[in-house]
């Protein structure tokens, strides 16, 4: 390819569909039965209503409108290049497809992005790369397995060579969705880069 554009929704659904077609189970069921239950990891992809009481609401800070309006009043050529890149990204087709259009309802209204992740629909959905829910201990346990060669307590999750392949740089450069930042990606992981150490 000639460019990169972060898109968690597409990436997760593509891999989830491969799992479903090869194995027959949804990605949430597969993760639960093959990883979470086996390694006692408190993490789920797609919640049951009974899990909601354990789930904290996300509270996102919206950009202060006075800051946005301040930058809109300044001629573009006077803005620092980083601010110009952010503005260009927010108005780009790629950004809108990745983060705005997905929130449209059937009547074409854009849902409140700050409230959407707290809805029952979002929490129940199995969105492989975007809405896993887990405890801090569960996330730490999962990544401790990966950081220790893919095994724990005599059970193997991944081979070391698979982990090495997943964390090998496959894509780098200005990202068309993430504000033209110099991000690096492996196979499923954002890698160490100036803006994402």
List each model region and its residues.
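Short, surface-exposed loop or secondary-structure junction motifs
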Residues: 1-196
């Amino acid at each position: 390819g000639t460019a990169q554009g972060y898109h968690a929704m597409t990436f997760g659904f593509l891999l989830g569909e491969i799992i479903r077609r090869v194995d027959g189970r949804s990605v949430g069921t597969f993760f639960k039965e093959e990883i979470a239950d086996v390694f006692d990891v408190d993490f789920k992809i797609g919640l049951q209503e009974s899990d909601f009481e354990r789930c904290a609401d996300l509270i996102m800070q919206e950009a202060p409108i006075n800051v946005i309006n301040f930058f809109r009043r300044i001629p573009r050529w006077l803005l620092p290049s980083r601010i110009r890149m952010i503005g260009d990204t927010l108005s780009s087709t790629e950004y809108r497809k990745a983060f705005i259009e997905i929130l449209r309802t059937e009547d074409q209204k854009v849902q409140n992005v700050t409230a959407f992740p707290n809805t029952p629909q979002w929490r129940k959905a199995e969105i492989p790369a975007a809405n896993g829910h887990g405890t801090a201990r569960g996330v730490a346990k999962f990544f401790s397995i990966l950081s220790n060669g893919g095994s724990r307590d005599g059970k193997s999750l991944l081979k070391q060579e698979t982990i090495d392949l997943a964390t090998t740089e496959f894509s780098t450069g200005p990202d068309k969705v993430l504000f033209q930042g110099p991000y690096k990606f492996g196979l499923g992981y954002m890698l160490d880069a100036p803006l994402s150490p």
